[in-house]
Amino acid sequence: MGCYDYVRFENKDYVLPDSLPVAGIVFQTKDLGGNFSTIVIDHDGSLVMDDMWKLFQDIEFYFYTVVDGVLYEYKAFFQGGVLTKIEVVL
């Protein structure tokens, strides 16, 4: 099992929830109106998202995990409001 340190988004105001489940990577977004949205990426790379994420057109974001003491960085790509890929940043 890994622990999840932080998520870095580009040009947005985002916050991590207080606790992260071991089942996957979970983080929340907070818009200017104070509304929250949650996104989950499971260990198998599958994405669970709510309707708010479907509003995004083109966005890239980074997230990090530490597994067995090794730091992994990932970059996720949305195009046209759809997640198109998640890649490991080497």
Annotate each predicted stretch with a short phrase.
Residues 1-24, 33:
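Amphipathic alpha-helical packing elements
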Residues 60-90:
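Short, compact, well-ordered microdomains
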